[in-house]
Regions:
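Short helix-to-coil transition segments within interhelical loops
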Residues: 6, 262, 271-280, 353, ...
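C-terminal membrane-exit region of the final transmembrane helix in multipass inner-membrane proteins
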Residues: 9, 324-362
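Hydrophobic alpha-helical transmembrane segments of multi-pass inner-membrane transport and secretion
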Residues: 10-37, 233-268, 291-300, 341
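Hydrophobic, regular-secondary-structure patches
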Residues: 25-102, 206-210, 216
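Peri-transmembrane interface segments
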Residues: 41-44, 206-252, 261-266, 271-272, ...
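A short beta-strand structural signal in non-transmembrane regions
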Residues: 52, 138-139, 160-165, 186-211, ...
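Hydrophobic secondary-structure segments that place a key small or acidic residue at a functional site
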Residues: 90-91, 99-109, 118-177, 186-187
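Transmembrane alpha-helical interface segments in multi-pass membrane proteins
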Residues: 246, 267-312, 330-334, 338, ...
Length: 362
């Protein structure tokens, strides 16, 4: 009976299910985009291969917001610490032309000592001041090839090579070049430290904190756990607002749909009540139909989310969208709960109808 009632009005059912699907897709995609970008950034930072990362006081864990540069002379003091094998200073800038990409200014020798060097798809390492390396994902997304010219940060660069992704940034230039462009002479945004043995990391971190008590000292093996929305000011609030908007959309659509349904089925409700149907039975019918609509919409929304992810990644290879079972279930639950709340008043209204008046309704 419930399924028949839902299918009896196919157009309204379709529109309602689409609205719920949009709600579910909106939640999954917003969370998937933010989570994917955070996780991808964390993996790139861990991929540098260092054991410890040092940033200026109060610097953000997100490299594009890494704070004021530090004196590069700090690197010489860090090299003197016990168990330290290599230290690589890095200056971080971000390029906002055609997207937002992190640019690393590196000293090739020290960066190679920490990261074991780049894996080249084509070309060669940095040799001239205007050389730039791009990773394979950036090259694919922007259609960049070795030997081409690039204009970023108001500067013309020569693409010296395309490297495997996962070394902290997508673009790499000489440290001295980026220092001059940024007006940050003898400065660095980050120091990466490679220890002689991984188990010496806690001891080295203690020494660094004694040497630089106000600086941010982070072990890179736990970096992924730090890349959450709560560590980026405003991101958690943004996600909650978007979820709230999605819930309101679902609530209003279900409310209007079920309210109209109750009005149209007034005589039917009168017949049921005249045959002895209880208020609880009427409420269960309305809420069961709502649940069925929300389930159909949720399933469609999940499918639409995976379809959109496939399309977006094909169109924008540098984009990362993480869809997890946890958020698929949460988005579905949000849609169903919001739908039931939206149907609560129409269900209550239906249960309160007087059978005599309902049967006389035209």
């Amino acid at each position: 009976m419930i399924l028949q009632n839902v299918l009896h009005r196919p157009l309204r059912t379709l529109i309602t299910a689409i609205a719920v699907a949009v709600e579910v897709t909106m939640v999954i995609m917003v969370v998937g985009l933010t989570s994917g970008l955070l996780l991808e950034n964390a993996k790139r930072v861990e991929g540098v291969g260092a054991d410890i990362m040092i940033q200026p006081p109060s610097a953000s864990v997100f490299l594009a917001f890494s704070g004021a540069p530090m004196p590069i002379a700090i690197g010489e003091k860090l090299k003197e610490l016990d168990y330290v094998q290599a230290v690589a200073p890095v200056l971080v800038q971000f390029n906002s032309v055609n997207g937002l990409d992190v640019v690393f200014g590196i000293d090739p020798a020290s960066f190679t000592a920490v990261s074991n060097g780049f894996v080249f798809h084509s070309g060669h390492d940095l040799q001239n001041p205007n050389d730039i390396l791009v990773d394979d994902i950036y090259a694919k997304a922007k259609k960049v090839k070795t030997g081409q010219s690039m204009h970023i940060l108001d500067h013309d660069f020569h693409v010296a090579g395309v490297v495997e992704h996962g070394k902290g940034a997508r673009l790499f230039v000489f440290l001295s070049t980026l220092q001059e462009m940024a007006g940050a002479h003898d400065k660095a945004s980050i120091f990466y430290i490679k220890n002689d043995r991984t188990d010496h990391t806690p001891a080295v971190m203690d020494e660094v904190r004694q040497l630089l008590p106000r600086y941010e000292v982070r072990p890179l093996k736990d970096f992924i756990s730090l890349m959450t929305s709560s560590n980026l000011p405003g991101l958690g609030a943004f996600i909650n607002v978007m979820i709230g908007i999605a819930v309101v959309i679902g609530f209003l659509v279900i409310f209007l749909s079920m309210y109209t349904t109750v009005i149209e089925r007034t005589r039917e409700i009168g017949v049921l009540k005249s045959l002895g149907a209880s208020k609880g039975y009427i409420v269960r019918i309305i809420l069961s139909e709502t649940t069925l609509l929300c389930l159909a919409g949720a399933i469609a929304g999940i499918g639409l989310s995976f379809l959109m992810r496939t399309v977006f990644i094909r169109l924008f290879p540098a984009l990362s969208i993480l869809i997890t079972l946890n958020w698929v279930l949460r988005a579905s639950a949000i849609a169903i709960i919001g739908g039931l709340l939206g149907a609560s008043y129409p269900a209550w209204l239906a249960s309160r109808k007087d059978p005599v008046e309902a049967l006389a309704y035209e």
